[in-house]
Amino acid sequence: MGSSGSYLKSGGFTSQEWEQVGEIKSVKILRKIGLKKDATGNLPLYGNTPGTAYILLKPNGRFHQFRQYGEDRKAKFDIDYGRHNSAKPYLHMHTYSGKDRPEPMPITNAKGDIINKSLYEKYKGFLKGIKL
């Protein structure tokens, strides 16, 4: 799958650090090779295929992150389920500006109320194990 770092001169990425462990709606579910059993991490900053997306699940199989890549293979936006500055996890979106990931745009609140219905409807099929 690639690493979260450098391109090789011959094309593609440095040594493989990710493996595919499944799919949801034709989007590959990735797992970082060698990650501690209870750790999750984040998806790579670059995708192997222009315009692709990947999904990362928590070790218990629940949704953690969806990352969409642009035609330049760089991360475009993330949909995350986590406690970003909150006591309870909530669904939120980060869009990338260069390598920066600005403050999240909530899709749900910590109570599970849907705030951005159009984004929720578009991505709800990827939210394995998330109960709102």
Label for each model-derived stretch:
Residues 2-132:
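Catalytic toxin/effector domains delivered as secreted proteins or via bacterial secretion systems
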